[in-house]
């Protein structure tokens, strides 16, 4: 560890805390009190403070003390306090570690002792509850505070957590969301890792301290600028990092921290050379990996593993479908199928592979380091010793080929695999080798939930918009009314048996009754009168009487005398305390100065209570819904597009209460006649809600037909799906008529294109179309001959032919045709053995320019280079044939991505300067090229994250009510309370002509 981290794991935590207790705290006390003596004694994980104020002695026992790594051990918990930088330009930033943060916490609490005060033991102990202050500070808070439980999942998770840094101010002045903000800056280089960051909204906020950096005296200093010392511990442990796209390397590093530790560690065959000699570091297994398609089971990141592989990790439970695996290069997927060893594809010598991952996305994700690792891993396995490939200095292609030759292995890194089921060879050589994989903490048994009652999955505002736009008013009433678990005493909270189907709800929605109660707490009445909503001012007789009449927080020109009680709300408790304080002040006839201060405090607490009482979200649908379930998804070949596979336990949980007895035949019959609604958040389009007929399947994952993935924006890398069961006859009818796959296509015929074969299925059809026999085979899947006799069978050609089937033969026939085409294409891809050559690019054109090549020269030739690639038709080439076919058939990727991966590219640095890279990512970038590329890659990733954050707001703006009556205005307002208070003051009547207002109240049927 000392060699990996020459400055120590994280010495700044303990140093900062020691400085607080030994220097800064006594200095503070000396300024506020007559401090005569102060000392600290530390032993193990505790310290003892002794101090004298005037002539009074105080001893503080059992004060927490962090260990050498900066970890506090309290009541069986391990806690760490993240350092915080006040500027994203870290070379200029002040960094506050635990000691500085604790000082800020304690300083306002230390009162100044008045001159002449007589100190007693009791007074001093109550004046300076130092031990309690420190314990209060060290209590983790919700919402991303700096005090956090240590992530002890594995060794890397722990080390990286202790070496984490938080940046407070991340937006550049004047920057728009996602624009020139939260990206790498020059002052961060050498101080934090440019690769390793969170993948969500904390992307620019949380950083991993570089191996060569240290926090000292309130600054973060770069002590070593050698390339591998600029990385975090985890990123530096990725071999061939310079062959990976920066965002994929980010994913790889993050997922290594999520790997479950096996019973027995196994070191990787291919090392980066920076790994410490710590057995607990190794959480994965070296798996013989084939980068080929294996039909439907490897579609959209699905994994096929062998039975031996399922057992080899030594976890408490063997792997099963739904388990998520990842490697160090950012490839991830869930197990879709576990095959007997003798059914797996096998090497020429009969060795079965352990894991199959599809080649189809490799040229677009550009995490080519895994291919190089596979090649070198075979050498390491052959030699029986580890091989080293540093992050920035792994062996080049010629060295790898020579090593392969010297060890009796194919110098291409590829060989023809055989199908384990019948021994037949695949049609072309495939890349295969040993790659280090780990199992993430996201195990399927922990992710599957099924709730006939509570706790339940939530349906929110976006789901409401989708249902509203489809005209599913009955489902809205059922989802946000009948099946809402917000209503106290709901009969569906703990249902053992229900009379199915239930009647359609007729009462008010829980969200509206909740709104009425909230408004009443601040003196506004909202009552239905003859299908209209009347607003008026009202008293709150059972509420908290205010000590003084106060301006209404929503309508300052009106006075309020009482508020509703919500004793469990912190905002109400604070208001109650402020009210009691001013009551005492007034009763004691205190000076106006004190009375005015107390009045201002009461007004502030009242405003905070009002804000908490009616935030904008209170005007939006969002309910925990009974009879809901959730699980990880995986593909299944026996399902058609109208079906979804529910795990056995989930099926019984949802449908069991609808049956008089636990009878499997009755269950299957009921499921076959029923619809369930599948939903994958965020619900940004109509097809994010799909109705399926459910069938029982073994295991702990929800199974999908692969053709529906694009409709749900889902893939098989760990995505989860929520499932909801309608309980009313009308809701059930709407599910089938409005939300089924057929219903969506009948409403919008273009949706059929999204169901057409894609990814490996489309590649396989294009591959078949290269020969007359294969083309005839594809054409035979149609009810009549529709495919052209020449030209590439690309996405457009297939989609047009399928649309013709719909027009001539009807939608059911078109869907059946898609099923046949998808199965044919997937099988063709599986048999092809198509892969990505680890040394691809030897046949690609190179720019013809003087040396050194300039940016302008590259731009002059880029279009010509792209044209040269697109003019090629050698799809059976061992060099880039499969990737060329994927691009030209519209399967995946672009010619620009082929150029970037194989030829060269122009990238943008942190100062927006252009830099030409004269070789493809597959060859490996120099350290400087990696760091420059990372800036642009992360900027793009942050823009995507920022856009995702804005999608909900954009959807709200697009779908919000357009009316001008009270409810519609309040739904649009950032302060709905003001809208309601003014309506009450004017005694307004909302006629409820707006559809959103009627649905919100529960009058959809009116």
Region spans (language model):
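Core catalytic machinery and nucleic-acid-binding channels of phosphodiester-processing enzymes
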Residues: 91-101, 116, 280-286, 294-297, ...
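Helical mechanochemical/support elements of P-loop NTPase systems and associated helical scaffolds
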Residues: 77, 94, 98, 188, ...
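Conserved N-terminal architectural modules of multi-subunit, DNA-dependent RNA polymerase core subunits
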Residues: 1-203, 207-304, 314, 320-323, ...
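OB-fold/S1-family RNA-binding modules
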Residues: 286-290, 294-296, 301, 324-325, ...
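Phosphate-interacting basic helix/loop segments used at nucleotide- and nucleic-acid interfaces
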Residues: 36, 53-57, 63-67, 174-180, ...
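Extended, low-charge hydrophobic alpha-helical regions
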Residues: 470-471, 480-492, 868, 872-1006
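Long amphipathic alpha-helical segments
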Residues: 331-337, 370-372, 408-416, 434-454, ...
């Amino acid at each position: 560890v000392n060699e990996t981290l020459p400055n120590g794991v994280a010495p700044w935590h303990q140093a900062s805390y020691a400085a607080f207790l030994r220097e800064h705290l006594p200095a503070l006390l000396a300024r506020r009190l007559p401090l005569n003596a102060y000392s600290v004694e530390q032993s193990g994980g505790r310290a003892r403070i002794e101090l004298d104020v005037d002539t009074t002695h105080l001893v503080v026992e059992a004060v927490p003390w962090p260990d050498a790594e900066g970890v506090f051990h309290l009541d069986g918990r391990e806690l760490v306090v993240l350092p915080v930088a006040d500027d994203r330009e870290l070379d200029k930033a002040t960094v506050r570690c635990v000691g500085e943060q604790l000082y800020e916490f304690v300083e306002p609490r230390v009162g100044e002792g008045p001159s002449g005060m007589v100190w007693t033991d009791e007074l001093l102990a109550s004046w300076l509850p130092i031990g309690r202050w420190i314990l209060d500070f060290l209590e983790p808070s919700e919402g991303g505070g700096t005090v956090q439980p240590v992530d002890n999942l594995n060794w890397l998770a722990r080390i990286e957590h202790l070496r984490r840094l938080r940046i407070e101010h991340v937006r550049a002045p004047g920057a728009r969301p996602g624009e020139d903000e939260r990206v790498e800056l020059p002052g961060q280089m050498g101080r934090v890792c440019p690769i390793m960051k969170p993948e969500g909204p904390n992307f620019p906020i949380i950083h991993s301290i570089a191996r060569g950096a240290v926090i000292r005296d309130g600054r973060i200093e770069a002590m070593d600028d050698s390339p591998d010392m600029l990385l975090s511990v985890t990123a530096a442990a990725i071999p061939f990092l310079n062959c990976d796209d920066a965002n994929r390397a980010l994913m790889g590093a993050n997922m290594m921290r999520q790997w479950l530790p096996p019973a027995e560690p196994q070191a990787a065959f291919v090392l980066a050379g920076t790994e410490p000699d710590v057995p607990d570091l190794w959480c994965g297994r070296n798996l013989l990996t084939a980068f080929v398609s294996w039909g439907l089971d490897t579609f959209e990141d699905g994994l096929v593993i062998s039975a031996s592989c399922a057992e080899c990790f030594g976890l408490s439970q063997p792997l099963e479908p739904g388990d998520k695996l990842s490697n160090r290069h950012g490839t991830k997927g869930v197990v879709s199928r576990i095959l007997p060893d003798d059914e797996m594809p096998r090497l020429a010598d009969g060795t079965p592979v352990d894991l199959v991952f599809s080649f189809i996305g490799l040229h677009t994700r550009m995490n080519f380091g895994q291919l190089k690792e596979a090649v070198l891993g075979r050498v390491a396995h052959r030699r029986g010793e580890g091989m080293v490939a540093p992050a920035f200095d792994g062996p080049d292609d010629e060295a790898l080929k020579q090593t392969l030759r010297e060890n009796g292995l194919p110098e291409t890194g590829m060989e023809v695999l055989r199908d384990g089921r019948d021994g037949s060879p695949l049609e072309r050589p495939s890349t295969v080798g040993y790659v280090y994989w780990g199992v993430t903490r996201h195990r399927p048994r922990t992710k599957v939930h099924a709730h006939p009652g509570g706790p339940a999955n939530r349906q929110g505002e976006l789901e409401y918009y989708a249902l509203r736009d489809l005209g599913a008013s009955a489902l809205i009433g059922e989802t946000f009314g009948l099946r809402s678990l917000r209503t106290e005493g709901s009969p569906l909270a703990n249902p053992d048996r229900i009379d199915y189907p239930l009647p359609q709800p007729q009462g008010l929605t829980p969200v509206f009754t909740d709104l009425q109660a909230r408004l009443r707490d601040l003196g506004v009445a909202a009552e239905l009168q003859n299908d209209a909503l009347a607003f008026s001012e009202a008293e709150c007789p059972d509420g908290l009487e205010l000590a003084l009449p106060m301006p209404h927080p929503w309508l300052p020109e009106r006075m309020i005398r009482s508020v509703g009680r919500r004793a469990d709300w912190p905002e109400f408790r604070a208001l109650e305390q402020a009210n009691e304080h001013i009551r005492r002040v007034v009763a004691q006839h205190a000076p106006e100065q004190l009375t005015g201060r107390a009045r201002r405090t009461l007004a502030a607490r009242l405003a905070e209570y009002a804000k908490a009482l009616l935030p904008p979200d209170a005007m939006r649908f969002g309910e925990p819904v009974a009879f809901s379930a959730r699980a990880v998804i995986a593909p299944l070949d026996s399902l058609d597009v109208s079906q979804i596979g529910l795990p056995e336990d989930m099926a019984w949980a949802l449908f069991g209460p609808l049956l008089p007895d636990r009878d499997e035949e009755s269950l299957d019959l009921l499921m076959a006649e029923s619809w369930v609604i599948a939903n994958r958040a965020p619900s940004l389009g109509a097809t994010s809600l799909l109705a399926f007929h459910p069938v029982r399947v073994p295991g702990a994952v929800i199974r999908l037909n692969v053709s529906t993935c694009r409709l749900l924006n889902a893939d098989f890398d760990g995505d989860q799906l929520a499932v909801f069961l309608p309980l009313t006859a009308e809701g059930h009818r709407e599910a089938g008529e409005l939300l089924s796959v057929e219903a969506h296509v009948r409403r919008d015929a273009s949706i059929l294109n999204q169901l057409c074969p894609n990814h490996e299925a489309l590649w396989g059809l294009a591959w078949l179309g290269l020969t007359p026999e294969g083309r005839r085979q594809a054409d035979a899947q149609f009810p009549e001959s529709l495919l052209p006799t020449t030209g590439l069978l690309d996405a457009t050609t297939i989609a047009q032919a399928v649309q013709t089937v719909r027009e001539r033969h009807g939608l059911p026939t078109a869907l059946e045709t898609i099923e046949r085409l998808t199965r044919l294409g997937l099988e063709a891809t599986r048999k092809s053995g198509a892969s990505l050559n680890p040394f691809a690019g030897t046949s690609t054109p190179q720019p013809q320019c003087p040396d050194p090549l300039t940016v302008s020269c590259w731009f002059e030739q880029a279009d010509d280079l792209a044209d040269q690639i697109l003019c090629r038709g050698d799809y059976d080439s061992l060099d880039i044939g499969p990737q060329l076919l994927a691009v030209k058939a519209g399967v995946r990727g672009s010619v620009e991505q082929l150029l970037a991966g194989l030829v060269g590219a122009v990238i943008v640095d942190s100062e927006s300067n252009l830099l030409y890279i004269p070789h493809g990512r597959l060859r490996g970038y120099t350290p400087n090229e990696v760091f420059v590329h990372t800036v642009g890659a992360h900027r793009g990733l942050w823009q995507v994250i920022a856009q995702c954050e804005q999608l909900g707001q954009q959807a709200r703006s697009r779908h919000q009510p357009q009316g001008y009556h009270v409810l519609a205005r309040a739904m649009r307002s950032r302060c709905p309370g003001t809208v309601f208070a003014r309506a009450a003051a004017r005694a307004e009547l909302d006629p409820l002509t707006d559809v959103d207002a009627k649905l919100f109240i529960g009058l959809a049927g009116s």
